[in-house]
């Protein structure tokens, strides 16, 4: 993880810039395409192709080669799905002006996939928030970071097919939705397969599958963390990164999932006090959108001085000078977006607001409560946070709790403390009463972090082979909402040799 909160704009490399420019030129005649896969018309064929791929953990540490195995030998298969997705975004729930709070973005900019903020002449970078209001009794399936782990993704879809939730790529159960929490590529060798699978789900269920934008959904990240290299090895100069870059612009940085007047903030990173969703949550459409516009963190701090007071006294001057109003020009320019980057403390005794160099702001229990309270509308309330992002290759207190909690951790456990930071899983479960059962109680003001998929550096470094997804069932009142955690050992990891 790289940027500081205040981050000077870093020029995109010339080679990538040329690739992006060429790619956008190629999209000019893409309008009106209807997606249909000839190679993989059904999920079963796609599943079989992915099953032939070696695991990420088998490939880690091997000498670099000029070629990578892929289930998508021709980039055209991906490009066709991407262009169909663009049409779906343009003509679906984003199309009616009535679904946009504060005004619909310009067709010649936001919806013009032949232009981009990362090229000249640039169009504005326009991050946005989404509301997804579902009927009481609905199921919403959540998954955290994949980071190029196609085997865990396929295992999740297998599980949902076996449960009757999915029929292939199609959601078979009524009032069932899927929300993915960002970081789909980088740090793994099958990012393109993960993106393609997301697109297949989205195209089969355009109004029920949604993807949040993580910090790795950024054209400035992919040259550094592996996705660009992966695709160049698979497709050489046939790879079209501009299509990928524009896809990311249609992913909301935050999705407020709710029923009635109760909502959960669902995003990749953490809190962003510079955007308050009250007007969005009070809007009449069940699916609604709002551009973030100017991010007004400095204004929030002035109106809510208790947030700064919740910080350690030695950090307040720095925090006050760093949290300021700004207009976003790119995901990390001039400042990083908190929904994509920020984190949370592990223990309730830690400060309500802090900062970690290389990642961003860290919100504690009191600071989070302040922002959640301010996020309410006239009737709507934000009850908590579902997110991902906060993972490490190395064993640390957060990863210990994610693994001991069977892939889902509720921050600020009542019986946990800094004194038990490095406790074993057995101690965390017995003495700290760390939640690890399938059913989890939802508490007002709680923050939940989903683990990263296991066929990865993270799984290897922290010695786990199971993947996790959550099933949220909404109710007429927030007290009736239920959360179920599903774990499964990934088949390709069962026979890994020692050390992998």
PLM segments and residue spans:
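N-terminal secretory signal peptides that target proteins for export/translocation
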Residues: 1-9
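Bacterial N-terminal signal peptides
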Residues: 13-23
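Sec/Tat signal peptide C-region and signal peptidase I cleavage site
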Residues: 24-29
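Feature recognizes metal-dependent phosphohydrolase scaffolds
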Residues: 30-500
